[in-house]
Amino acid sequence: MDINAIKTFLEVAKTRHFGHAANALFVSQSTVSARIRSLEESIGAELFIRERGNIRLSPSGEALMTYAQGITTLWARAQQEIASPQGARETI
């Protein structure tokens, strides 16, 4: 699992635009496309329906949305929890 791919998925779902997601994430549009493609390949389903400049979540993308939000929340908590004891030890 690539946490950056999950975050990219959430940003594309939010903005409904690969270019806008790229700008928000400070990466290139090709990086966004590659991350989404990789995620789709690992899951085995298309996550977005792409129609003439319009992007929307596919049924699989909608199903992934809740899990993706949970994953990023847990990841942030883990980072905070792991970083906190280290910071406390350094200040002693």
Task: Give the ranges of each region predicted by the language model.
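Short, solvent-exposed amphipathic helices
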Residues: S60-R77, P85
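The N-cap/first-turn positions of alpha helices
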Residues: D2-T8, Q29, G61
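Hydrophobic residues on short alpha-helical segments
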Residues: I6-A13, S58, M65
